Curated annotation (Swiss-Prot):
PANTHER family, A to Z: D-GLUTAMATE CYCLASE, MITOCHONDRIAL (PTHR32022:SF10)
Keyword Amino-acid biosynthesis: no
Gene Ontology MF annotations: lyase activity
Annotated Gene3D superfamilies: PSTPO5379-like, PSTPO5379-like domain
Name of the protein: Putative hydro-lyase Reut_A2449
Organism, scientific name: Cupriavidus pinatubonensis (strain JMP 134 / LMG 1197) (Cupriavidus necator (strain JMP 134))
Length: 270
């Protein structure tokens, strides 16, 4: 492929990402797996300034689950990851947390930034980013095939605490043909800024998952004969910390509903 053709492909991908954000700003709600292929996606959590240092330390101590791509200063809502984007409106669905409890989901978080003008926002790498390379390698991504949300599970693995924050690891799951698991691990492992290689392969009970067909977040997916469940660290882990730690106030993305950036996935390939 010539440089000119590569530039055209990148331009089309950026245009797709911007179109997606514009549609979410206009009120469209959908999981973002498979949206703007080739572009990086990010989880989001915004907390009052008083909790920002605790979370930054929590992310630093748990980089597999919480790889920070950008930190937006208190009260601001623009990011270097997407020119012209507004973090308050350009995610398809937000969750609102008060005292560690989920109180509502909203499509427009603007009033929450007005209510809490000191919110510090963290954008965290998402495994949706390496799904395009998986597909390009001929590895099926079941939730994209089925047009559903990725299944996510709370586990029995505790994250390293930091300050007032503690909680368990959350994982996403993709069923992978046994013959392709090594390939999936190698491909995803080249993207450490978006969770990297799997944290567990096989027996879900070893993670404390009693029923793999009943995810804590997202949708259940088919696991066919010859496939093995493969688990990756997940950016919903901060939401588990919000619940466990009783954080007074926080805004997050709804699981599976990410911030689609203008940054090519190749940026985070090592």
């Amino acid at each position: 492929m010539t440089n000119h053709m590569l530039d055209e492909v990148r331009s089309a991908a950026v245009a797709a990402a911007r179109t997606a954000r514009e549609s979410y700003r206009a009120g469209k709600i959908q999981p973002t797996a498979g949206v703007a292929p080739g572009m990086t996606q990010a989880n989001m959590i915004a907390l009052p300034r008083d909790w920002a240092w605790d979370f930054l330390l929590y992310a630093q101590r748990n980089p597999k689950a919480c790889p920070v791509l950008d930190v937006i200063e208190a009260g601001a809502y623009h990011t270097v990851l997407a020119e012209g984007a507004d973090i308050r409106t350009d995610i398809p669905l937000y969750r609102v947390w008060r005292n560690g409890r989920l109180v509502e989901e909203v499509a427009d978080a603007t009033p929450l930034w007005q209510e809490h003008p000191d919110l510090v926002t963290f954008l965290i790498g998402c495994s949706f980013t390496f799904e395009t390379p998986l597909l390009e390698a001929g590895i099926e991504v079941r939730h994209i095939t089925d047009g559903s949300n990725v299944p996510m599970y709370r586990t029995n693995r505790q994250c390293r605490p930091a300050g007032r924050l503690h909680g368990e690891l959350v994982v996403s799951m993709r069923p992978i043909a046994a013959s392709r698991i090594a390939d999936a691990a190698m491909i995803s492992g080249r993207f450490p800024s978006v969770h990297g290689a799997p944290v567990h392969v096989g027996n879900p009970e070893a993670l404390g998952i009693a029923d793999i067909h009943r995810p804590d977040f997202g949708d259940a997916v088919r696991i066919e004969s010859g496939e093995i469940p493969v688990f990756w660290a997940c950016g919903v882990t901060p939401q588990a910390a919000v619940m466990a730690s009783g954080v007074p106030f926080a805004v997050t993305h709804a699981p599976g509903h990410m911030f689609v950036t203008d940054v090519p996935d190749s940026t985070y390939h090592v």
